[in-house]
């Protein structure tokens, strides 16, 4: 069993138990008193490449636990991030839905990053202050339904893709925020070429977020040059001796990069994906 399969099985069991303790109807009732969330899409829309900075306590890909606290990193991110991703999966990433609630105090659009396997988690995200939810193609059972549920709750989901087929499925389902994860979720290996290969398939009217693999300003510049509208950066910032300095360097690297993607000719497309 792969690490992805283990995580999915774990999340399904945990959400089943959570929904017994707090039924979905009870979660829905909590939403009636909440203000509208900040717009995640607006935060990523502009004339420059946007940055989504991530808070996570651990990562199975590195086998490490990160010692920096949420509030320490939020103080850094509020000075340069356009939005913040908060990992809430607890068993493998040591995350918590409470981190999302605490991060919502900073007035920055938040992405709940998790392995979403049930609409219960979408309601949970909204109740905890999220502006967006990560929905992974092939993990969430009904992509179109998941997108619709997010929008009913005034959130725009980030739909994560790993292949050309994933992108076409996401577009067909109505996704407006397309994420390309440079990390293979089965092997945990990173390849920035994935964004370069898949970016031309994303229409200009949609926003493309390149996820994972930015270890420094050079990587950020490469991905921005591939046509990413936004970069999601986590591990390098969590590991940096001075995350503020690294964030400044990344901001400077992408400052002059304008969003925009090339298009494949028919021959180029078939050569790329043959």
Curated annotation (Swiss-Prot):
It catalyses: 1-(2-carboxyphenylamino)-1-deoxy-D-ribulose 5-phosphate + H(+) = (1S,2R)-1-C-(indol-3-yl)glycerol 3-phosphate + CO2 + H2O. Gene3D superfamilies: Aldolase class I. One of its GO terms (biological process) is L-tryptophan biosynthetic process. Pathway: Amino-acid biosynthesis; L-tryptophan biosynthesis; L-tryptophan from chorismate: step 4/5. Keywords: Amino-acid biosynthesis, Aromatic amino acid biosynthesis, Decarboxylase, Lyase, Tryptophan biosynthesis. GO terms for molecular function: indole-3-glycerol-phosphate synthase activity; phosphoribosylanthranilate isomerase activity. The keyword Heme does not apply. The keyword Lyase applies. Belongs to the TrpC family. This is Indole-3-glycerol phosphate synthase. It comes from Methanothermobacter marburgensis (strain ATCC BAA-927 / DSM 2133 / JCM 14651 / NBRC 100331 / OCM 82 / Marburg). The lineage of its organism: Archaea, Methanobacteriati, Methanobacteriota, Methanomada group, Methanobacteria.
């Amino acid at each position: 069993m792969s690490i992805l399969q283990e995580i999915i099985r774990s999340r399904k069991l945990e959400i089943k138990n959570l929904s017994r303790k707090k039924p979905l109807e009870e979660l829905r009732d909590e939403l009636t008193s909440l203000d509208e969330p900040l717009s995640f899409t607006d935060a990523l829309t502009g004339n420059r490449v946007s940055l989504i900075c991530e808070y996570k306590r651990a990562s199975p890909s590195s086998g490490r636990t990160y010692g920096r606290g949420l509030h320490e990193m939020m103080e850094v991110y509020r000075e340069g991030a356009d939005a913040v991703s908060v990992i809430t999966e607890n068993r493998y990433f040591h995350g918590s839905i409470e981190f999302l609630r605490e991060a919502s105090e900073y007035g920055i659009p938040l992405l709940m990053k998790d392995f979403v396997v049930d609409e219960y988690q979408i309601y949970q995200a909204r109740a905890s202050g999220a502006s967006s939810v990560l929905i992974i193609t092939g993990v969430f059972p009904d992509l179109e339904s998941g997108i619709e549920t997010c929008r009913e709750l005034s959130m725009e989901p980030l739909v994560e893709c790993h292949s050309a087929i994933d992108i076409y499925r996401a577009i067909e389902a109505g996704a407006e925020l397309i994420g390309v994860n440079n990390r293979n979720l089965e092997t945990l290996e990173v390849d920035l070429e994935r964004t370069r290969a898949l970016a031309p398939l994303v229409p200009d009217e949609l926003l493309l977020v390149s996820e994972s693999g930015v270890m420094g300003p050079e990587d950020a510049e490469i991905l921005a040059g591939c046509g990413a509208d936004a970069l999601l950066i986590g591990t390098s910032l969590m590991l940096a001796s001075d995350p503020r300095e690294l964030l400044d360097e990344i901001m400077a690297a992408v400052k002059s990069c304008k969003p925009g993607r090339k298009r494949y000719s028919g021959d180029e497309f078939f050569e790329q994906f043959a």
